[in-house]
């Protein structure tokens, strides 16, 4: 959700690797390090599986905390996460992350993708993304695609590290929808929807 020109979400999206502080979007900053000093948390004993009926409340909660609702506007239409193909990462009874997908234009579209801050940097996001790619392959879909707002540099980096390439930029789409450019990650104005694609099946 965007209010008063800034992205308003009920919980921080990122965790500071220096002091462990949970960071709202506008307060987060990026830094460059060598691979040896890239912060990594302890390995988690999680599993990735298809969501079950009993996961509904946990899915609603992570959607609410990540974006404030379960209906997501992406790729020019509105998707309902609760009606999507949902994969969850869990450790015991705790939900660590969610990737929600839907078939769109003959490809598998990532509708919602979120990992709780305390579980980031521990392989959860990568495992969810690979599971989604596996889902696309099992359905003989040609590709998996995702969309990122121009301000979300960490997610843009993450997707490209996982074999996605930029295929289209809907310039000004997000700003036009709101009537102004909201303030997102690290204070960057939110204007464009960057669409990425990763081939799955030949």
PLM features per residue range, with description:
Residues 16, 31-34:
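Short cysteine-rich clusters marking metal-coordination/redox-active sites
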Residues 19, 37:
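Short Cys/His-rich metal-coordination motifs, predominantly Zn2+-binding knuckles/fingers
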Residues 46, 50-118, 129-130:
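Acetyl-CoA-dependent GNAT
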């Amino acid at each position: 959700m965007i209010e008063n020109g800034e992205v308003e979400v009920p919980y921080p999206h990122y965790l500071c690797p220096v002091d462990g502080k949970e960071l709202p979007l506008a307060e987060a900053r990026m830094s460059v390090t060598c691979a040896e000093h890239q912060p990594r948390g302890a390995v988690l004993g999680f599993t990735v599986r298809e969501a079950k009926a009993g996961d509904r409340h946990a899915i609603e909660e992570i959607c609410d905390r990540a974006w404030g609702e379960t209906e997501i506007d992406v790729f020019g239409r509105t998707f309902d996460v609760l009606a999507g193909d949902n994969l969850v990462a869990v450790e015991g009874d705790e939900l660590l992350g969610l990737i929600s997908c839907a078939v769109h234009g003959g490809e598998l579209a990532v509708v919602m993708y979120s990992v709780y801050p305390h579980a980031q940097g521990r392989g959860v996001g990568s495992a969810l993304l690979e599971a989604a790619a596996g889902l696309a392959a099992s359905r003989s879909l040609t590709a998996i695609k995702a969309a990122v707002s121009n301000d979300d540099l960490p997610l843009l980096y993450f997707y490209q590290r996982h074999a996605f390439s930029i295929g289209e930029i809907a310039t000004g789409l997000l700003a036009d929808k709101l009537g102004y450019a909201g303030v997102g990650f690290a204070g960057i104005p939110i204007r464009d929807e960057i669409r990425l694609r990763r081939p799955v099946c030949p």
